[in-house]
C-alpha cells in the first residue's frame, strides 16, 4: 500500500515505523524539507509541493497541520491518527479509551487520572507524549489520552468510552480560523459517541446544539467545590489550589464514573484515590515557584500559552504586586480580554517576542505600566532591578513560544537560568 504521511513529527514517525514493519511504501511530506532526502531511519522525505494525491492510497496528517494547508486540501484518502488506530481494533484487541481535552489543564488532568487508574493498567498517550500506534503495539488495555482540538477536528469515527472537556477559551485561532471552529472541534466527538458512552462537560455548553443532539450520556460541571461535593470529598482534603484543584476534582470524577461503569463502588476506592492524588507532583513550567539568591519569589508558568491560563495564574497572586512577562506567538488571539482584567491587579508588564508591539499598544490604551524588552533575558534583568521581597515575578506569557524558542519547556528553562545567573 502506498502511504503518505503529512508532516514529519513524533506521531507520523511512529506510524511510519509501523507501516514499514508491515511492508508498506511510506513517504513523508513536510514544508521544512527543501528537497528530497532520506532521513536517519531511511524514510523517503519530500517537500510538500512534491505530494501527488494520485500516487497515494492513504494519507495520515500530523495534527499540527491545519485543514487549510495545501497538503490537506489535495489529499484524497485523508485519515486521522485516531481513526486509523480505530480501524485496527478487532475482537482480539480493543482497549478502553478515555479522552481528555480543553484549552488548559488537560496535561495535568491526564497525568492525574492515569495515576488514579494505575491498578487498571492505564497508560497515557496522545498529545502527552506516546503516539497511539505505540500504545496499540504494547497492547495496553486502558488508554488515557490527552486529545488536542487538531486531532478532534480530523477524527470522523473514533470515540472514547468517556470524554472529559475541561474548558474552552480562545486559543489556536490561527489554525482553526475562528473561535466557532475551535469550539466545534472540541465538541465534534460528541456527534460520534453512542448512548453507551459518557461526556463530562462545562455547564455553559449544556444548551449548545452539538451537546443537545449528542446520544452520549452527559454530566455537567461548573466549580471544583461542586464536583468534590458530589463525590463526598471536602475541598481541604486535596493539596491543590486554583486551576489545579479543578483538574484534581475532574480526574476524581472521571475515576468515579469509570468505577461505576465497571460496577465497582466509589466508597471502596475513595480514600486510596485521595492518597494517590495528594502524592501527585505538578509538572515543570506550570506555576512552578522558586526563589532567587535574595529570596525573592519567581514563578515559571511558561506553559501558559493562552489568555485563560494567564488569568488563572494571576488569581493566585491577587494580593501582591505582580511583575508579569507577557508575549510570544499569540496565535491570532485578541488580548483585549486579558487587559480588561488587569484593572483588578497591581501589575507591571514586560513585553517579549513577536507580539511585543501589540502588548505595548494595549498597555497604552488600558493605562498599564509596560516595558518593551523583546528578549526574555532583558525582561528578567529589568525585573531583577526593581523586584521587592513582598512582590512576585511571573512568566505567564499568554502566548506560544515558537517565535523565539523551540518549545515552552525551553522558554521556561531559560527563564530559570536567567533568574539564577549572577
Swiss-Prot record:
Concerning Pfam families, the annotation shows: Mur_ligase_M
One cellular component (GO) term of this entry: cytoplasm
Spell out the InterPro entries in the cross-references. Folylpolyglutamate_synth_CS, Mur-like_cat_sf, Mur_ligase_C_dom_sf, Mur_ligase_cen, MurD
Q: Output the GO biological process annotations, alphabetical, semicolon-separated.
A: cell division; cell wall organization; peptidoglycan biosynthetic process; regulation of cell shape
**MF terms per GO, please?**
ATP binding; tetrahydrofolylpolyglutamate synthase activity; UDP-N-acetylmuramoylalanine-D-glutamate ligase activity
Any idea which UniProt keywords this protein has?
ATP-binding, Cell cycle, Cell division, Cell shape, Cell wall biogenesis/degradation, Cytoplasm, Ligase, Nucleotide-binding, Peptidoglycan synthesis
Q: Does the keyword Ligase apply?
A: yes
Enzymatic class: ligase
**What EC number(s) does the entry state?**
6.3.2.9
Q: What is its main location?
A: cytoplasm
Compartmental location: Cytoplasm
| Source organism, top-level taxon | Bacteria
Q: Which residues bind ATP?
A: 102-108
- Show the catalytic activity: UDP-N-acetyl-alpha-D-muramoyl-L-alanine + D-glutamate + ATP = UDP-N-acetyl-alpha-D-muramoyl-L-alanyl-D-glutamate + ADP + phosphate + H(+)
Pathway(s) of this molecule: Cell wall biogenesis; peptidoglycan biosynthesis
Function comment: Cell wall formation. Catalyzes the addition of glutamate to the nucleotide precursor UDP-N-acetylmuramoyl-L-alanine (UMA).
Family assignment from sequence similarity: Belongs to the MurCDEF family.
* Protein name, per record: UDP-N-acetylmuramoylalanine--D-glutamate ligase
Species of origin reads Helicobacter pylori (strain J99 / ATCC 700824)
